[in-house]
Amino acid sequence: MSTIKIEKKSQLVKEVFDSVASRYDTMNDIMSLGMHRLWKDKMVNSVHFTKNSKVLDVAGGTGDIAIRVVRKEPSAKVTVCDINQNMLNRGRDKAINSNQINFDWVCASAESLPFEDSEFDYCTIAFGIRNVSDRKKALNEAHRVLKPHGKFICLEFAPMHYQNEIFTKLYDLYSFKVIPKIGSIVAKDKSSYEYLVRSIREFPTQADFKMEIEEVGFKNVEFHNMSYGIVALHIGTK
């Protein structure tokens, strides 16, 4: 299994999401058997969003998290930021179809956010942090734009480490054989889904990622596994 080189990752990620944008939601449903919707629900429901709070959703082009936030707290002011304009376009269309027209949509990198220091009360990122080229820089930026006591909420796939050899082999078979095949059939793009699988496998463990979040200054960092550790929710406070 080849490692994704950092210097090439940014362009690769852009190409991947340019390719899959139009079928991204469909593929998520197929690959996760619809579970991604439950994981996102649990992510948003785990946080008490205060009235009139400012929320930044990074790598949020699909609009999934933003829509859930305003359904939970209608007074929230949500900014959706994504490096990929095609994903933002899809998210904007979805938001309009959900009668959500008051979001701000910003095309920018998680590693260089075009916002003031201490501007937001909450910073969310779902299934996006593993795709940034420089994770520490992205975490520093999230910390910078949050107000004191602001919350960082991150939902991400976790590398699977099971002692059960049979389960591990089945998971690897599904990840490296079935998912790319589905990508080839449904999205006509096998290589993009091979990348997505590799990016999960190369992501740090839950405990190691917790330490990375702490290293940029977040306090009271905790994580909660979902679906037996397939995904994890990390929450930290500035």
Curated annotation (Swiss-Prot):
E.C. designation(s): 2.1.1.163, 2.1.1.201
Domain of life: Bacteria
CDD domains, per database record: AdoMet_MTases
Cysteines joined through disulfide linkages: none
Keyword set, alphabetical order: Menaquinone biosynthesis, Methyltransferase, S-adenosyl-L-methionine, Transferase, Ubiquinone biosynthesis
One Pfam family cited in the UniProt record for this chain: Ubie_methyltran
BP-aspect Gene Ontology terms: aerobic respiration; menaquinone biosynthetic process; methylation
Catalysed conversion reaction: a 2-demethylmenaquinol + S-adenosyl-L-methionine = a menaquinol + S-adenosyl-L-homocysteine + H(+); a 2-methoxy-6-(all-trans-polyprenyl)benzene-1,4-diol + S-adenosyl-L-methionine = a 5-methoxy-2-methyl-3-(all-trans-polyprenyl)benzene-1,4-diol + S-adenosyl-L-homocysteine + H(+)
Binding site for S-adenosyl-L-methionine: 62, 82
GO molecular function terms attached to this record: 2-methoxy-6-polyprenyl-1,4-benzoquinol methyltransferase activity; demethylmenaquinone methyltransferase activity
Span of the signal peptide: none
Functional pathway: Quinol/quinone metabolism; menaquinone biosynthesis; menaquinol from 1,4-dihydroxy-2-naphthoate: step 2/2; Cofactor biosynthesis; ubiquinone biosynthesis
Function, in words: Methyltransferase required for the conversion of demethylmenaquinol (DMKH2) to menaquinol (MKH2) and the conversion of 2-polyprenyl-6-methoxy-1,4-benzoquinol (DDMQH2) to 2-polyprenyl-3-methyl-6-methoxy-1,4-benzoquinol (DMQH2).
Protein family according to the UniProt entry: Belongs to the class I-like SAM-binding methyltransferase superfamily. MenG/UbiE family.
Protein name, as recorded: Ubiquinone/menaquinone biosynthesis C-methyltransferase UbiE
The organism of origin for this protein: Wolbachia pipientis wMel
Source organism phylogeny: Bacteria, Pseudomonadati, Pseudomonadota, Alphaproteobacteria, Rickettsiales
Gene designation per UniProt: ubiE
